[in-house]
Amino acid sequence: MWGLLLGLWLSSVNPPVDSLEQWLQQGVALLPEHPAQAATVFVQVVQIDSTYISPRHGAALFWLGQSLWLLDRQEEALALWERGLALLQQRGWVDVRIADAYVRRVFMMQDRSRYGRGAQVYQQLLALLDDPALDTATLQLLQPHLEALSWILPPAIAARADLAGLIQQKRITRPGVGRLLLAWWRSQDPLPVTRRNERLEEHLERVGYALTHFVDPDEGFDDRARIYVRLGPPWRRVRLSVSNPWLRRKVFARMPTLMEIQLPRGEFWVYRHINRDAQYVFVSRDNKPYRLGTSFDLLPSRLLSGIGATTRGQEKARAAIRILAELYGQLATNHPLFGLRYQDLATYALWLDELELAEETANWVRLRSQVTDLPDELDPETQRRLNMAEMMGVPVMGGMRYPGLGLADQPPHLFALRMIQEGKIEEDEAIMRREEHVPRVYSNLFEDVEPLPVAVRLARFLDADGTTRTRLYWSASNKAFQPGKLAQKRLREAGMIGADFLVTATLAQRDEAYRTRTLHVRRQQVWQADLNTEGVAAPMLLEARGDTGLYHLVLQVSQFALNRATQPPRPGPLLKITSIRFDSLQALNADPSVLEMSDLLPLWYDPAQNDTLPGRPYPFARLTRDVPLALYFEIYHLTFGADDRTHYEVSYEVRRREEGGLLRRDREVQTTSRTVYEGTDRTAREYIVLDLQDWKKARSVEVVVRVRDLISGQEVARTIAFEVRS
């Protein structure tokens, strides 16, 4: 690295200055016009003090890297900033300029080899929000990062951080904002097995792309940046244009006050892979930043304002119809929302052309009948028009009908006004559906790998030491493990068609701030031959121990091809993956004076089981009536009575939603049962068995189990729900 700096030494004569601060100011003054000369000055500064930080300009290494960047030596600039960050970190410092420049440039260049380090530096920037010495200049540098974060944060988290106030007022209004945002980002990490936060890296890559393509120098991010950061690259991106010869001849040539350059620029984005309602029209007026709008925002306002029955109003109506037909044609090609209205507009615009041609032909027929002495040779255009007139004949004049399009016949101005009014209502309704159905954030992380559908059920139990033990059972059908088209393609590329599989399940145990405490891993082989029959895999157990407060769990299940050609066999390409989060789990109450109860653990009831459980765990959310269902639970902190025994009542309530049949609403049916028990231990282990045979019309079922301590009078309850299939 320092060889690089020596290579920048372009002169053996020191500048006529007598301090590092003066040298630094001299170098800054040379930018951006003279980066090579500035680099020479900055090299001298860092050779004397590599960590020099100016009170006014910040770290000298930032400015040296900036000079290299302007000299198109991006790789050297990034390497220099990396070294600078490490040197300053050794002294407990973070230079905001270096950190911000490094994060921006890494992700703007999409330098994936540096994504991990870039994400770490970004988190250091967020941590600065808790620094009491944070100043306005630092907040100004953090502004784009905070703005992009505000687009994806859940509203509750944004409100807790008062992110809107932080962005607008450029001052911290709530304590612990940095810790809150860092904890939230840790919660978004989808793959606990890796050391990197892939979702954070994806976000920063999107922000880097937005900084490159969707930023106005004066006004910052436009609305395209917001949608891109939220949803990623669109399935289809179309630049909307009305620049074609037909419109020039039919519209712009006839209206001198209306010019092509006056029309707003437009883009149409479609996210078909997310939701059918995920479609966005962006409009840029007068070269201002793109903003979300509708197709009607792409028309000049003065064109829409004067539509009426007058000659001028009819002329504007015909122009609006033709421009809308062109725009709707481009929109309808990419989204069905605009299809029917495009048909109406295109049909009417075609009729306008035919009407004009008919009028033109009639005029030429009359002209032909009036002119008896024509020259032997006519110019080509006159001859063409006369030929057309003779072919068309004289159209019927008067009593002219307008195209009904299945509706009442309308002249141009009424048709245009109706199309505009109905179109605006239609697009407003589409925007409402979009707000309702399109997720706030969409990730593309797993698009290159098939999903692995698994069933999961967890239950919390209280251990003797007062900590909570969480038992997580998962399973999947044989069909779920079968490779799909994408997985088969990967198997073919690896030459492993017909291979068996290795399934790795990892349970990440996280503390309240989403820091990973422990990883629990289990692996099992899945044989290709076993997947040809119907059935499900035996439930696999993963267990987390030692929790005492708020905690979080993440389950990651990955399916690999198993390469048996090596000894020992090794995992091949990744074929399928799933990641499931369990946020904000609360440890059970360890206070011995408070009655407590475990979660309900569903079992496939088998009284012949010799295990501690009367059956095998049933992790599926759906039931059929042939499933012998049992619910196992444990009771803690029962109170001894005068006879040195515990006395408690267990009741359960089954709420079934049954199909009402033809013309009848679904109805809810409830059944209740109570049993009194006594024991000699403060901890009891119980289970109840449910008979599903009578649930012939049930569509869903909810079971509430209540335990009441007859000595202390305390009560505790747990609930579990299932869907029921015939």
Task: Go through the PLM ranges and name each one.
Residues D18-T51, Q66-D72:
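Alpha-helical segment of the N-proximal tetratricopeptide repeat
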Residues W2-S11:
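Sec-dependent N-terminal signal peptides
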Residues R312-S726:
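Intrinsically disordered, low-complexity terminal regions enriched in Ser/Thr/Pro/Gly
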Residues D18, W23, R56-H57, W63, ...:
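Structural signature of alpha-solenoid helical repeat junctions
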Residues V46-P55, A86-D95, L134, T138:
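Flexible helix-coil transition and linker loops at the boundaries of alpha-helical arrays
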Residues W63, L70-E76, L80, G92-D95, ...:
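Residues within mature, well-folded domains
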Residues G84-L87, I98, Y102:
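Amphipathic, hydrophobic N-terminal targeting peptides for secretion and organelle import
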